[in-house]
């Protein structure tokens, strides 16, 4: 199949990488697994056994008329522990490489179908100036965009760093969440070829 290049002739690309069907279930699984892998999972609360104190019983077992109590650190006491306290846990989910790559292929194909993939021969800025990059993107009618190149250009990265709706990634750093989060994906021809190598 062919992909139209913004500032040059169309290029021939792999049907497998850029022309497959959209598998919503698989993409959802990949996104959930990716997001879950980014969770810290370090939240921790104290149970009745973790809270300091409470060793001596507050009053004797019998004779006071009050309900029996053996500690002041039970969950029903002020200053006591939490009933079902949160513990550190690993939220990561297993996703096979084959499935992850298939999800990326599915996303790329859907970007092409929905006209959200803008292919250019090359994309760079001469100096790390945010204003220059903004003018360049506005000239192309892009304001909410992910820029994907073969290797991240330092000037481009610095110029885009302060723009809230612009992100710069290389092919290796592109993930399912970043690829679907932006209105448009601006990708260089060399990055297209790299995607074909990795996912073909």
UniProtKB/Swiss-Prot annotation:
Transmembrane segments: none annotated. InterPro entries: Ribosomal_uL4, Ribosomal_uL4-like, Ribosomal_uL4_dom_sf. It comes from the Bacteria. Residues 38-72 are annotated as: Disordered. Coiled coil: none annotated. One of its GO terms (cellular component) is ribosome. GO terms for biological process: translation. Belongs to the universal ribosomal protein uL4 family. HAMAP family: Ribosomal_uL4_B (MF_01328_B). Part of the 50S ribosomal subunit. This is Large ribosomal subunit protein uL4. It comes from Pseudomonas entomophila (strain L48). The lineage of its organism: Bacteria, Pseudomonadati, Pseudomonadota, Gammaproteobacteria, Pseudomonadales. The gene is rplD.
């Amino acid at each position: 199949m062919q992909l139209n290049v913004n500032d040059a002739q169309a290029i021939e690309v792999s049907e497998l990488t850029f022309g497959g069907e959209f598998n919503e279930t698989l993409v959802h699984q990949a996104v959930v697994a990716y997001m879950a892998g980014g969770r810290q999972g370090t939240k921790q609360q104290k149970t009745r056994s973790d809270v300091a104190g409470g060793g001596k019983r507050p009053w004797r077992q019998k004779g006071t008329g009050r309900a029996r109590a053996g500690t002041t650190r039970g969950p029903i006491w002020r200053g006591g522990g939490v009933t079902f306290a949160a513990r550190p846990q690993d939220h990561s989910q297993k996703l096979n490489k084959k499935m992850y790559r298939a999800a990326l292929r599915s996303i790329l194909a859907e970007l092409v179908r929905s006209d959200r993939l803008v292919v250019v021969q090359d994309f760079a800025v001469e100096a790390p100036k945010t204003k220059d990059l903004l003018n360049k993107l506005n000239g192309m009618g892009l304001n909410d965009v992910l820029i994907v190149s073969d290797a991240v250009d330092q000037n481009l990265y610095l110029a885009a760093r302060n723009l809230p709706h612009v992100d710069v990634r290389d092919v290796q750093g592109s993930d399912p969440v970043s690829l679907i989060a932006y209105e448009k994906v601006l990708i260089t021809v060399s990055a297209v070829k790299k995607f074909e190598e990795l996912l073909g």
